[in-house]
Amino acid sequence: MKKLSILGVTGSIGTQALDVIKNSNGELKLIGVTANSSVEKMIKIIEEFDPKYVGMMDKTCAGEIKEYCDKNNKSTIVLSEMKGLNKIASLEEIDIVLTSLVGMIGLEPTLEAIKAKKDIALANKETLVVAGELVMSEAKKNNVKILPVDSEHSAIYQSLRGNDLKTLNKIILTASGGPFRGKKICDLNDISVDDALNHPKWNMGRKISIDSATLMNKGLEVIEAHWLFECDYDNIQVVIHPQSIVHSMVEYCDGSIIAQLGAADMRLPIQYALNYTERKNLIAKTLDFYEVSQLTFEKPDLETFKPLKLAFKAGKQGGLMPTILNGANEAAVALFLDEKIEFLDIFNIIENCMNRFEEETKKPLTLENIIELDKKVKKYVVDMK
């Protein structure tokens, strides 16, 4: 039996991970869970899975959970705020931590889990985007596996198994193209929140759905792939693949290309990461090639979807520049979801911040500098409006 904590259990990845656990025939045991403020969802999880530890970022919500547990004679240990997240990420009795928190908030507990020598099933891409050098160094020092949960990175991970990284020639990251594939910049005026959330293939949370619409999600995945697979940015290629069947590919030095294909179901990479190194019986629909009429691939439009281009630029510059990129994007997406800015404003805000905070990138890459700069960038974006 493998014991785990899930950070961000009430979100899209977290809830799909619960489905994986339910179908694991007792081979996966949930010990700790965290959420931000979703009290009702957390109570249902406590009733069904009976985790020993529950953490809520919101202290008031943690109080509500504790009151519920006391009234119902639950022995659940309820923790709160970042201290609680860090504790649940580093519990002595767990084997692996699924980090499915959205945004920069996932960085600190992920590092705490690594220092406690817990393997990481990583769904929080921002952790590697802003601190890839720190995280991978810490993982190597503590002999910790970083197992990607993103479908694309899981595909690459599987395609690389049994092969030497030195034989890797190129990573080919596939992207669905999002809801606005084929559109030009002039077509992206007056885009509503609902338009941008309407992803054609994947069931995802609100923030990542907007990132997919701008192609920033793919940009963040490029930076993540650089750190996970020690691959130079010039050897990472993004291709638009609207069918979302080929989840990504690896080209080797001899020209051979190995791809991982499957249904567009996030439970597959979640299940693979949580059960690594074993493969378990499928809980999702399998791919039927008789129903696959075609597989097509296109070049991304970097002029229309500038966030992808900016992500390559930030990744190549390195240091603290990805922190600026990510912080500006997080703040801008939040404003767009609150209908305070237009869709195309997201693009302009990111580029503006990368230029404005250029001097900050001369500082050394430390956890303290990352956190400080992230706050500074987000405050600047919010104060703009």
From Swiss-Prot:
Pathway per the UniProt entry: Isoprenoid biosynthesis; isopentenyl diphosphate biosynthesis via DXP pathway; isopentenyl diphosphate from 1-deoxy-D-xylulose 5-phosphate: step 1/6
Catalytic activity: 2-C-methyl-D-erythritol 4-phosphate + NADP(+) = 1-deoxy-D-xylulose 5-phosphate + NADPH + H(+)
HAMAP family found in the cross-reference section: DXP_reductoisom
Task performed by this protein: Catalyzes the NADPH-dependent rearrangement and reduction of 1-deoxy-D-xylulose-5-phosphate (DXP) to 2-C-methyl-D-erythritol 4-phosphate (MEP).
Keywords: Isoprene biosynthesis, Manganese, Metal-binding, NADP, Oxidoreductase
Entry EC number(s): 1.1.1.267
Residue positions binding NADPH: T10, G11, S12, I13, N124, E126, G205
PANTHER family xref list: 1-DEOXY-D-XYLULOSE 5-PHOSPHATE REDUCTOISOMERASE, 1-DEOXY-D-XYLULOSE 5-PHOSPHATE REDUCTOISOMERASE, CHLOROPLASTIC
Binding residues for Mn(2+): D150, E152, E221
A GO MF label: 1-deoxy-D-xylulose-5-phosphate reductoisomerase activity
Domain of life assignment: Bacteria
Disulfide bonds: none
Protein name: 1-deoxy-D-xylulose 5-phosphate reductoisomerase
